[in-house]
Amino acid sequence: MIPYLIMTFLYFVVAIVAALAASFSMWNILSWIHGMVWLRVHFITLGIVTQLLFGTIPILTAKTHNLPRPKTRWDIWLLLNAGIALLLVGIPTTNKIPIITGGTLVFTATTLLLIQLAGIRTQSEKTLAVKEGRKFYIAGLFYFLIGILVGTGMFPDWAEALGIVGDIGEVHIHANNWG
């Protein structure tokens, strides 16, 4: 949990700096920063929110099943943060290589998180009745996976291959919001 909180704080500070930079850009003090809107959005969503969720979901799942706090999965943490770093390089430059690589790493980290959560559940000796809330949170992670896939596919133009009709950006935003 602690590494995720450290990264949350880091992304929070960077998001504030990016917001200040946007203000300076708007006032033509630092005009070269135009086009960084989506970078700020992703600092908040990927940086802050994702770090908090990836850090707390395993703990809450273990607590629900009366299991000890799980150890930090450094592989998940590293994949998530390497992916975010690559996305934060690729998004403002619209470079496909860091975007696809970063999206793939975040997708892999999310998949490993789902596997970790399933493993926590199977470690439990007591069988919990399936609750609607659990289905909701599992669906949320799957929507997040869809949002990652669509967001990664925005720049290489995967819309047709993914069967998306209309604005791919809207699909990406709404999938991540539901996730």
Protein language model regions, located:
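Hydrophobic alpha-helical transmembrane segments of multi-pass integral membrane proteins
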Residues: 1-179
